[in-house]
Amino acid sequence: MKIYLVGGAVRDSLLNLPIKDKDYLVVGATPEQMLQLGYRQVGKDFPVFLHPKNQQEYALARTERKIGLGYGGFSCHASPDVTLEQDLLRRDLTINAIAQDEKGNLYDPFNGIEDINARLLRHVSDAFVEDPLRVLRVARFAARFHALGFHIAAETLALMRQISASDELNALTAERVWQEVDKSLGGPHPEVFFEVLHQCGALEVLFPEIFALFGVPQPEKWHPEIDTGVHTLMVLAQAALLTEDKSVRFAALVHDLGKALSPKEHLPKHHGHGQKGLPLIKALCTRLRVPNETRDLALLVSDQHQNVHQAFELRAETIVKIFDKADFWRKPERLTQLILACIADMRGRTGFENNPYPQGEYLTQCFLAANNVDIAAIIAAGFQGAEIKQALNLRRIEAVSQFKQKMQTKLPTDEQ
């Protein structure tokens, strides 16, 4: 019985990155032996055990055989005669197929160390095509290690295209797809994840609403990058620079879905695209089972981002109506999220990357003015029932109007 450290821990150690989780591989043991040693079995489909003291995962060496569609369509064979190399052979990428024994010796039958040094994401074997989840995993690794200079091997990208052209991606569950998206949204370069999916053909299958944006033109005056799909990924990249909030990043990704529905005769203009995108966002979020809070922010950003961009031109009544509709009174953090997504939208354009966004501070101050209206004073003045809400609304509008008048000389555009 031999125990090896495998997978991400070995890879990240070689890259001098922090190690989050440690996974161990056990060669030459049976489930009965593991149980006798005090390990607790947790794997149903294949033998995975938790260490009796530190609760880390120890998996018995195994081989896999494809028997059906999807990432779950495998028959696993675990026995003491499965070798270290046989187990490593079933892994996705060479950089994840390196093992380290208890003395620190490295075992690298598929040249993963060489690929780490070459900054190359390369598949271990042609069995790569048997698991469609690997398309998303490789895209995520490309995004995660983008700053280190990693790129996908041409032959691996070809296999990813092969998977995308088959029916295999459709066999992935919504939960697994969203899990990979969620992990990528939390990384430093989520835009690379979607760039890779676009390159290999998976974006069209899994995210048709986003795929439809590529090739859709925008006015060159405001969008020197022209292509809406390119703009979308630039906005996502800017959102990642602005905040670690994954909901804001997702909202940035889907804020312009409605542009794909603009009539061809109206291009490159996109009137009402924010509202047109709402059903598309709802459909995407329902299909992928996106968390409700993330979905709701995405809908808010799509619906209101044009108003936020034009904040200086809005009447006080309109501003308060937006605050009401978004329920900022109870959820003031959503205003911050909305503004962050709008900053990303503004900066996600060629040549606009470092521009200021005074609309954000302006709307924040409008909200503070409106939110400072004293409800107790309204009640004390004798208002009752529905009158209270009406009086509150009027006083909030008046508060915003007074702030606007005070700011009149400082505004970049005329107030009409």
Curated annotation (Swiss-Prot):
Q: What is its EC number?
A: 2.7.7.72, 3.1.3.-, 3.1.4.-
Q: Output the SUPFAM superfamilies linked to this UniProt entry.
A: Nucleotidyltransferase, Poly A polymerase C-terminal region-like
How is the subunit organization of this protein annotated in UniProt? Monomer. Can also form homodimers and oligomers.
Gene symbol of the encoding locus: cca
Protein name from the UniProt record: Multifunctional CCA protein
The record's remark on the cofactor is: Magnesium is required for nucleotidyltransferase activity. Nickel for phosphatase activity.
Read off the InterPro entries from this record.
CCA_bact (IPR012006), HD/PDEase_dom (IPR003607), HD_domain (IPR006674), NT_sf (IPR043519), PolA_pol_head_dom (IPR002646), PolyA_RNA-bd (IPR032828), tRNA_CCA-adding_enzyme (IPR050124)
Taxon lineage: Bacteria, Pseudomonadati, Pseudomonadota, Gammaproteobacteria, Alteromonadales
> Which cofactor(s) are needed, names only?
Mg(2+); Ni(2+)
Q: Does RNA-binding show up as a keyword for this record?
A: yes
